[in-house]
Amino acid sequence: MSDSLERLYLAVLAARDLDPATSRTARLFQRGPSKMAKKLAEEAIEVVIDAVNGDTDAVVRESADLLYNLTVLWASAGVRPEDVWREMTRREDMLGIAEKLPKSAMKLPKVASPRVAARRPIVALEGRTARKRH
């Protein structure tokens, strides 16, 4: 998967200076980060709606659009895919692959940590119950 996102990222970088009249990517770069963010949010909402409606095929299609728009926003912000992979590795080393860092842990110093042998196990998400946020 990361190879596909790497290729997409490189294609986005190559397309950003094309003619906005013929390139959707160039048009997004021309319109700036706020338009990119709006498109990303729209795609995220579409993924959520399709998932709630149980439309798996639509979730797949909209997820591809979501990843495209995320990659465009990364490129605009100067974020490279390997920056994200490095953060994911750091989090995995701390908590396991299927966990999100709590907000209090976000302020921990960045450490170039080697892969930790004793990680938390990967957990199945199907058995978890949804909690309502307040």
Curated annotation (Swiss-Prot):
Top-level enzyme category: hydrolase
Keyword line: Amino-acid biosynthesis, ATP-binding, Cytoplasm, Histidine biosynthesis, Hydrolase, Nucleotide-binding
An MF annotation (GO) of this entry: phosphoribosyl-ATP diphosphatase activity
EC number: 3.6.1.31
GO cellular component, as recorded: cytoplasm
PANTHER family attached to this UniProt entry: HISTIDINE BIOSYNTHESIS BIFUNCTIONAL PROTEIN (PTHR42945), HISTIDINE BIOSYNTHESIS BIFUNCTIONAL PROTEIN HIS7 (PTHR42945:SF1)
Descriptive protein name: Phosphoribosyl-ATP pyrophosphatase 2
Protein species of origin: Bradyrhizobium diazoefficiens (strain JCM 10833 / BCRC 13528 / IAM 13628 / NBRC 14792 / USDA 110)
